[in-house]
């Protein structure tokens, strides 16, 4: 039987340099950053099904990391000294984007699947949008492209964004006219590894819930803490380090059987609502109530969603 290989990738991203002049608050900046991510750090491993690593790659993107107007839009921009230390020690290499993509393409060809935790972001947004940016950057139409992006950002902050990708949930990574099957590790973990009572109890005991309190956290960090029993583990949020822990998560999932191409938009929903779980496990109800109240304390509206949360609190208080 042919040995299978898996490429596990992670990216760290900034966004377009004019985002800050268009966004009126942090949420609008976040919305632009999610819609228009520019990769500045990319790393990947190639491993077998046991998690043995065959190859590792890690690069800083010259056109984004070394351009302050771009890198300063990154959520983790304070990590610049850490990156420069890594660069000085030759622990990470800086290359132009096109050179990195040539290496990535060759490694994708040598793998049976390309994988990422939240693959929809890395393979459907971050890499494709960076491709468009770099292509425009080295063209004679860059200013026209930037003007279109500025108008698009204005639409995003005004709550309207018609940039649709009909192939967003097709488990295929398209890169320079080549196609590679995707396995979304977030969805895989939610299906095979963390949708169980032990994990949900772990989340409730430690307050590991989503911001609204309605769902259990299911990030790579939280999943790895539970699966590796490394409960104090903190995700690095640098590309190769994160790809390494995601390689271990994949190996755990492969112990439960072979994988098939898959991608998910909201895999955390696999675990169900926290309030449904605490109906059967009422000792945790106060954890959920407190989290929802904390979320509501930051809101000042009378929306349907707010009223829904208030009704959930009322329901939980009667248990």
Feature annotation, model-predicted:
Residues 2-7, 11-133:
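Conserved non-catalytic scaffold segment of RNase H-like nuclease domains
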Residues 11-14, 185, 246:
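Ser/Thr-centric signal marking residues that sit
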Residues 64, 71-94, 258-284, 288:
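C-terminal or late-domain output modules
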Residues 74-76, 193-205, 218-219:
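Short, surface-exposed amphipathic charged segments that create phosphate/polyanion-binding patches used
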Residues 77-198:
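Conserved DEDDh/DEDDy metal-dependent 3′-5′ exonuclease domain
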Residues 113-120, 124-125, 202-284, 291:
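Acidic, Mg2+-coordinating catalytic module of metal-dependent nucleases/exonucleases
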Residues 296-307:
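Charged, low-complexity interaction regions
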């Amino acid at each position: 039987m042919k040995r299978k290989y898996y490429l596990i990738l992670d990216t760290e991203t900034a966004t377009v340099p004019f985002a800050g002049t268009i966004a009126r608050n942090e949420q609008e900046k976040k919305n632009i950053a999610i819609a228009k991510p520019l990769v500045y750090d990319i790393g990947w491993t190639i491993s077998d099904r046991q998690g043995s690593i065959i190859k590792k790659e890690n690069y800083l993107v010259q056109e984004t990391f070394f351009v302050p107007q771009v890198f300063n839009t990154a959520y983790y921009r304070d990590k610049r000294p850490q990156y420069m230390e890594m660069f000085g020690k030759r622990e990470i290499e800086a290359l132009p984007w096109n050179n990195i993509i040539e290496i990535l393409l060759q490694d994708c060809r040598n793998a049976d699947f390309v994988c990422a935790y939240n693959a929809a972001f890395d393979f459907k947004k971050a890499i494709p949008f960076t491709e468009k940016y770099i292509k425009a950057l080295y063209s004679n139409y860059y200013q026209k492209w930037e003007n279109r992006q500025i108008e698009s950002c204005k639409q995003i902050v005004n709550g309207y964004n018609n940039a649709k990708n009909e192939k967003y949930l097709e488990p295929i990574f398209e890169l320079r006219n080549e196609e590679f099957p995707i396995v979304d590790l977030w969805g895989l973990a939610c299906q095979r590894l963390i949708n169980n009572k032990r994990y949900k109890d772990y989340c409730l005991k430690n307050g590991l819930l989503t911001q609204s309190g309605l769902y259990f956290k299911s990030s790579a960090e939280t999943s790895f803490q539970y699966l590796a029993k490394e409960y104090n583990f903190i995700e690095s949020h640098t590309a190769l380090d994160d790809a390494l822990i995601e390689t271990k998560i994949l190996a755990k999932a492969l112990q439960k059987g072979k994988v098939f191409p898959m991608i998910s938009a909201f895999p955390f929903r696999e675990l169900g609502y926290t309030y449904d779980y605490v109906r059967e496990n009422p000792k945790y109800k106060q954890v959920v109530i407190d989290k929802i109240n904390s979320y509501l304390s930051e809101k000042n509206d009378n929306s349907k969603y707010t009223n829904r949360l208030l009704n959930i609190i009322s329901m939980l208080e009667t248990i």
